[in-house]
Amino acid sequence: LPGNVIYELIHNDRVIGGLNAASTNKAIEFYSQFVKGQLHKTNCRTAEMCKLTENSSRDVQIAFANELSLICDKAGINVWELIELANKHPRVNILQPGCGVGGHCIAVDPYFITAEYPTESKLIATARGINNYKSLWCAEKVKTAILEFELQNKRKPVVAMMGLAFKPNIDDLRESPSKNIVSRVIQICNNADILIVEPNVKEHNQFKLTEYKEAYGKADIVVMLTAHDQFKTLPYDEGKVILDFCGV
């Protein structure tokens, strides 16, 4: 529950299913001491599948948004404007695209379903593939921008990779697509001067981090990977190449 741990721990509903009635009742007794949300009793298989379903559902919805972003890029349409307009329909609620899906739940839980039921879970598996591919696509877009800059300016660019966390305003990097994109860009674009930014982390064991204002100021190419609030305060500079993969 990165970001709202205490609130969600207390206020979220709980689906509880033990191995038998006694264990289920004990779990309900425990959670009722601090949970203000409703406690829903079921069996253990349904409870486990409920958790996997919640996260797989989110993954599928994000995959639709990410696929739209790929289509819009090729069609020359602003995906953010498109989604905002489409969501004005009362029965449409498209999520925001990003550079993939991360975290230790949404990016992981669908595999438990697809591994056990591969024939029946084609939509879930396809969504996982789309969200994984989006990260590779983002890295290739950065590579293209670097090559175009070099051709036009006869020098290597300074590239600011903005954000490592898997979602805004947290310091959790688990399964982060942003981190994977940075690693891939470093691998395939080793002639570029790459500055790596994560304002919610003091240091990282793999990457040397640069303060976000400093990186933005020095950069020729700015790659928005995570929509941290700090990045939204940066002044627009038309002299920079901006690749915004997260809607900053």
Role assignments for model-derived ranges:
Residues 1-248:
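Structural/interface elements that position substrates and couple domains in central-metabolism enzymes
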